[in-house]
Amino acid sequence: MYNIIMYAIQFGIAVGSLFNEKLRKMWRGEQEAVRILREKVEPNAQYVWFHAASLGEFEQGRPLIEQIRKDYPQYKILLTFFSPSGYEVRKNYEGADIITYLPIDTVGNARRFLRAVRPVMAFFIKYEFWYNYLHVLQHRGTPAYSVSSIFRPDQIFFKWYGSGYGRVLRCFSRFFVQNEESKELLSKIGISDAVVVGDTRFDRVLQIKEASKKLPLVEKFINIDATDRKKVFVAGSSWQPDEEIFLKYFNEHKDWKLIIAPHVIGEDHLKTILSLIKDKKVVRYTQATEENVVEADVLIIDCFGLLSSIYHYGDVAYVGGGFGVGIHNVLEAAVWDMPVLFGPNNKHFAEAQGLLRDGGGFEVFDIEGFSLLMNRFAEDEEYRTACGALAGAYVESLAGATNKVLSNVKL
């Protein structure tokens, strides 16, 4: 059944590529993957293979990639993606020697791909469970590790009808899981080789903090050198339901500067944001100058790649997505020692639950709750600072997963 599904997906991507640009990139990338390997793989080199579904999973695996590259330079790095949103952004990443799409998990694709590269070990990030690739690796005696994986009782592996697909888990040499619950769930189905290491994203956000960029236009906007400057609210990866809440509040409160980095930066969405803002001077980042940004009340970030550095300038952060499919990266904000607000769809995000538990994160359901929180942060600086310190301490306390993984791997 699994292989039938894989062939159906492959057929669907092929047909869809005729009409959809994203699927077209995926289809072409998958078709070219083995050719790229045959051209670029060095016959006598030893390759460590990392597979990430998309950009978020890549960021989880990145600390591990870079630590191996630093400590074990004798190995080459192969990095694969399933999604164009990962590959297209990171296809020129300098931390890997070869970067390709991963062809759909059919028996033939897996055999061809692994004949072309023959890695000495493989790391699959978080939710990547590709049976045919893993089965070929296992058959060859190649260690395969699941990194930053997290399991819940409602997943198919732990249902009475999921035992067949659960075979894929037995192909891994070891699991590096995020929490004890995941380890216990694996134990219940007879998998004992699991180590609780935490989430490598904590290491990654600390790396990002260390490498953060100074942004002169943002510093001008917040009037960074003024002793009486306004507080700064940063909304990261926001969607319209998020924006409708916080903009309603800020339309009535003039004592904050507001930076909005929406998840979607298309013109239609930017126009919607502008329509929600009342009686404030607004500047887009791509149109900002040292002159006009100083007088602005709202700075809209209409380009990618700046958000993790922009959080540095905030006093309170809001991370979007919690009124939709799920919140975005709260750790990028929390690492900067400020309170982090987010919507209610956060239950499957361990880092959000941890921030809520430790007092550095706050759940927002509506404008009334948002207003109560923001009013207190505005009026009680000691409280706001203390909550921010708790957020930062939470991130620091859970760093170190990368070293724990490497201490359990033979390189």
Where do the protein language model's features map onto the residues?
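Inter-lobe coupling/hinge segments of SF2-like helicase ATPases
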Residues: 202-206, 224, 233-287, 295, ...
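C-terminal alpha-helical cap of glycosyltransferases
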Residues: 398-411
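Short, aromatic/basic amphipathic alpha-helical patches
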Residues: 89-94, 188, 270-279, 354
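Donor nucleotide-activated moiety binding/catalytic core segment of transferases
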Residues: 201, 283-324, 329-330
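Hydrophobic beta-strand scaffold residues
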Residues: 142-144, 258, 282, 340
